[in-house]
């Protein structure tokens, strides 16, 4: 089997996790208590969904997941929520005191105490796998736990499971909407370790997803639940090929191989189509070509950056539902002719496609319409650098005055770590610049030879 272990860290990670497991259960027909009436092979048969769920002898399906937070309130919601019987109590790990939006608390003082317990639980899950493929890590980098404990766990996972791939689903701070003053510090410090310890990181940003909910679903004031349900559709589409048998299956390691041209250039944009409310879906024909086009729309991107400002290096299209390869090829051919969608000159093909025949499911009473087919796109575009340069700019403004730094130093960090992390990100911005402008110098030189 190709099992994946999901690790949900901090409030954002846990709440996105709730939405994901709710959706997985719906897709596989698993009830809230873990029983699965439709499952014929009791006791861990070789079903495709066993990549995400382990089966007990009693026929109960338990998610291969760990939820970690430094304070109990968010995890208590899982412990008392609809799916409380789904998870093993040992999988829900909560501390007693908060990281207080402070990377240093999450990474050094408070996080240190809980990290061994987390690794112990992860080890138990890993021992239960026959062929562990990798980890899906869910966190946000603006807060204290997601950034601090998140990067600490990633560092330790690299030591313990060096060869296993790690996919990050990371919520980055939005340009306008902010949840804490020290977000820029936490994000820069955390990205420093994401750079080294994740293989692929998919950037999400609340503001971009708010806008999608407002525009496409006509929700005037979206809640986090609305946002998370949309994000969970993306994550479900990515992992569908691991959980169902499909026509063109895509493995977690394949994302890495196809999307990451250089190890550091591994921050991805994601988009999903069709995002459409039930009232509208009734009146629209959503063909493969149409949903493919809308996945490339700048307004569909789940992070606030404009792909028209950069070039694509590679992109991965995951279709699900009533889709045949012929339609996909036609849709991709059309995309390639568009002037607005530019690829770097050193990557002429640039498309990886996957098809899964399982149509997308929706949460009953949710906002999304039930549709016949959907596509999720993960793309590696140089425009992602906008996300980093925005955060770096805010970081510089605060750090020039050393504002709030004493809170971090007081928890045992050194000021040098700030400048080290900031330099690493400056190097990353430069890397993106060079990747986008790979062959321009050469072309200018050649023109002289013609006459």
Curated annotation (Swiss-Prot):
The record marks 451 as: Involved in polymerization. It holds the Pfam family Tubulin. SUPFAM superfamilies: Tubulin C-terminal domain-like, Tubulin nucleotide-binding domain-like. It catalyses: GTP + H2O = GDP + phosphate + H(+). InterPro entries: Alpha_tubulin (IPR002452), Tub_FtsZ_C (IPR008280), Tubulin (IPR000217), Tubulin/FtsZ-like_C (IPR037103), Tubulin/FtsZ_2-layer-sand-dom (IPR018316), Tubulin/FtsZ_GTPase_sf (IPR036525), Tubulin_C (IPR023123), Tubulin_CS (IPR017975). It is an enzyme of class 3 (hydrolase). One of its GO terms (cellular component) is microtubule. Disulfide bonds: none annotated. The modification N6-acetyllysine is found at residue 40. Its EC number is 3.6.5.-. One of its GO terms (molecular function) is hydrolase activity. Its cofactor is Mg(2+). Belongs to the tubulin family. This is Tubulin alpha-1 chain. It comes from Zea mays (Maize). The gene is TUBA1.
